[in-house]
């Protein structure tokens, strides 16, 4: 495939990082340019807060309202992740600007992390951390429940939840899904049913995407209804959690356990990241070895469609 177009297409990207996982290096760029001759790349300079950019396409994970306002003639934003909530869409004319994401490419990676956390709820090895004394560990273990004896609720139903459902079917787990979707093949509950039954759940897995309705969905009112020894697996968007209320809940209820995949530099996590009943991974849920192979593949497919003025895949608007 070698595509030539009359107009030069400018692609603005923020994929410049010390982490190889999120670094679009020269070799990757050259491979893309071999296939699409009339394109050029420019990296966002996050240190120049007033710089304006004239670009047709934005490709990355860090575009926010400030960067968006400094982009001139933008026609398409492609997120290199599933989450698209860094933009306030009240300020984006979705009739003029296409928005797509990279859903499904890292679903397996996130599922693997959740599975790691979920299995630990029945052993609490992460809570014991470096314990090498079985008598001391037994104090922790006696408060655990085997997965087969737990009542589990998953907040949200998408690609990752479908994988959890298949795992649940295989191991005969008691698992319900909070979702507005009606599906006879899964045990779906609505928000009212969830609120009425919170006290019955041993483990709650948060996979909620962020929107105005889900802002601080997990708040003091909900935490107060939970079991005092609840297991919380929080890999959804941080904005769906009232972190102050979470901090208060974990401090008060030492037998509760929280597993979180979040940005450790997040100021609101300062209070809780050293608690003994929380285990935080540094926002690596989406990490997997073939990220760039899949990311470039979906971007190139959409770039070809964009240049041909055809409908893009994974559109969110």
Say what each PLM segment does.
Residues 93-105, 228-231, 247-262, 274-286:
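Rossmann-fold dehydrogenase core element
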Residues 42-52, 65-68, 186-201:
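Short acidic low-complexity segments
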Residues 1-55:
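N-terminal glycine-/charge-rich "phosphate-binding" loop or analogous flexible N-terminal tail
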Residues 181-271:
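Rossmann-like adenosine-cofactor binding region
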Residues 2-4, 100-113, 127, 265-317:
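C-terminal helix-to-coil terminal segments
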Residues 56-131:
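Phosphate/diphosphate ligand-binding glycine-rich loop within oxidoreductases
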Residues 59-60, 79, 205-206, 234, ...:
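Redox-cofactor binding/interface segments in oxidoreductases and associated redox assembly factors
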Residues 128-163:
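Glycine-rich NAD(P)-binding loop of Rossmann-like domains
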């Amino acid at each position: 495939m070698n595509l030539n177009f009359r107009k030069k297409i400018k692609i603005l990207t923020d994929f410049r990082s010390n982490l190889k996982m999120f670094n679009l290096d020269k070799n990757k760029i050259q491979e893309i340019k071999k296939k699409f001759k009339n394109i050029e790349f420019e990296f966002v300079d996050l240190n120049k807060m007033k710089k304006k950019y004239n670009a047709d396409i934005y490709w990355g994970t860090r575009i926010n309202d400030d960067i968006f306002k400094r982009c001139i003639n933008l026609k398409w934003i492609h997120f290199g992740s599933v989450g698209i909530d860094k933009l306030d869409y009240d300020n984006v004319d979705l009739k003029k600007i296409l928005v797509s994401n990279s859903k499904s490419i890292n679903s397996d990676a996130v599922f693997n992390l959740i599975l790691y956390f979920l299995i630990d709820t029945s052993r609490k090895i992460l809570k014991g951390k470096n314990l090498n004394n079985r008598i001391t560990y037994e104090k922790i273990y006696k408060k655990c429940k085997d997965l087969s004896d737990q009542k589990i609720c998953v907040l949200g139903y998408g690609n990752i939840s479908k994988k959890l459902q298949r795992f649940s079917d295989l191991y005969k787990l008691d698992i319900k899904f909070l979702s507005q979707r009606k599906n006879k093949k899964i045990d779906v509950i609505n928000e009212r049913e969830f609120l009425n039954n919170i006290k019955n759940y041993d483990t709650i897995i948060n996979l909620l995407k962020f929107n105005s309705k889900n802002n601080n969905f997990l708040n003091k009112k909900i935490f107060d209804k939970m079991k005092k020894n609840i297991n919380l697996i929080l890999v959804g968007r941080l904005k769906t959690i009232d972190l102050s209320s979470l901090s208060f809940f974990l401090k008060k209820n030492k037998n509760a356990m929280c597993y979180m995949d979040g940005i450790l530099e997040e100021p609101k996590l300062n209070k809780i990241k050293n608690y003994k009943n929380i285990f935080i991974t540094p926002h690596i849920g989406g990490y997997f070895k073939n990220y760039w192979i899949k990311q470039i593949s979906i971007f190139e497919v959409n770039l070809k469609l964009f240049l041909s003025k055809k409908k893009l895949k994974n559109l969110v608007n």
